[in-house]
Amino acid sequence: MNDLLKYAIIGVSVIISVIVLSFAITYYGRSRDVISVTGLGEEYFTSDQIVWTGRIRVDAYNKQEGYKQIAANQKKVAQYLAENGISSQEVTYSFVEVDKQFESVYNSNGNYAGSRFAYYTLSQSFTISSNDVDKVEVISREISSLISQGIDIESWTPDYYYSHLDDLKLSLIEKASKDARARAENIVNNAGAKLGKASTASLGVFQITSATGNDEYSYGGTFNTSSKEKKARITVRMSYKLK
């Protein structure tokens, strides 16, 4: 009786082991009937928004006189911008910043003896945001002509943006998805198999770089603002079942 029970237990164990092994083999086979590919979507585009910043600066021994001078210069800048087609709604002026400047003092022996107040430096930044990219580009280059009127003015390189990024992203995702499927079909057809439906999909990082530059792609995403002509790209990781 004990032998019969022993053989019965062994028999049941063997059956269970076979069932588990068969399931594992079937699952492994099914998991291999999948192909994963990465598709790329790229598109070149031209920025349609520009943001440009400049700064007016005045040096004065008297703070009140400095405010008067910078107000007069700001008026000339506003007039120049208006004459060149920039509306007041497109310009933002910052608060006037005031900094004390000091000069070194030396004793009769030529040794450093400390510092003393020399003059005030007052500065005011202005920023232009516009959809007329070409016009603002010209102004940013030619505004230095105000120097001949006694205005100390600085100009920074403009930043360029695009107002239809959401539409661009959707277009890139569509292109990347089609590219992924084309790649998968090419691989599968060469292997004599057939491609089924997509099982999983994941997006890569959205990148915007200069169209002609050598910007480096970043793991967290690149967003170039220094170039008017840009290139956008995104990758899509797709997995397809095989028929």
Sequence positions of predicted segments:
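Short, charge-dense linear interaction motifs
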Residues: M1-K243
